[in-house]
Amino acid sequence: MSTDLDLADGFSDVPPINGGVNELELDMRDCGGVVRIHRFSRTRGQADRAVKAGRAIRMLPGVVADAGRADDSRVKMQAIHMWHRDAVIIGKAALVAQGVIPPGSRTRDFSAVHEVEAFSRTRGIKREGILVHRWRVPRRYATQYRDVPMAIPEASVLLLAVRGEWEWVCEALRQKLVTPRSCRSARSCLSWKFGRHRITAALADISFNPWSVPELWLSRALRAVGFTGWHSNTRVDTAEGAFTLDQAFDAERVGVEVDGRCVHGTPEGYEATMMRSASLDRHGWRMLHITPTMLRQRPRFVLEWLAQRIHKRHRPKVMMSDHELSRIMLGLTPT
């Protein structure tokens, strides 16, 4: 009864749910803390008693999980798979399972996922921490991951982008699980669910290839006022190594870096930033350093400062107010 998903992710180490070993406990150990209980299952009585005693919970109809592991997203994924074999995991849980390190984490931490999403052609259900949509997503956008059906990463990224959950989208792009091009090729996976304009807008932002939300803000602002001649996350080779610039104006050799405190504010980050700027300066690049706070509070100042450093042909024809730019950066006003 074991599956590759549980054993590979350490599901087998489940504590006993009572003082003695019984068939239900053995099944839970084999299946990573969750079991399917049919009407005539030999362990149905044991499951009823365990639920009544608070040692197990009914996670989904016919699916019982160890109460001590019920919050584990991997257990929820396994429960969905046991409940309906055709259900396809999508969203944050799928991205973490496929290798994405969640925002703010240093490891592939499933605890960052508070709700596991899936879709099925024939069933839909909502329980605490579980949401299964009744969607008819084309099968070509689903794949097998350790015996559990999961949506391809591009489908999950596009879903999160349409919803505005850009921290996860940026991490998937930064960690190169997806690319703007691969996301464009999957645009029809949700075209029946969301309007064409919403998907087009999400893909337009993904095309910037932002690796952080502040980078996305800056890209939206540059596009809105009409800057030209720039590219996001451009690789520059120098004698000291290769560096990736947040925004680069190749003709002027002007780069823009959005320096956040969590990375650039540490002693190691500060030293790396200084060495990086010096190396790029030796290579003929002029670097402009801004912070997310500057961009959020004074976006017009940032854009006017940048405009002074580039050729006239690449400058915007008009400039917007801070209020207008802020709404555009946050995605409240379409561009």
Range-by-range predicted roles:
Residues 7-18, 42, 173-335:
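Surface segments flanking catalytic/ligand-binding clefts of nucleic-acid enzymes
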Residues 1-194, 311-335:
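Short gly/ser-rich loop at a beta-strand->alpha-helix junction or flexible surface loop bordering the NTP-binding
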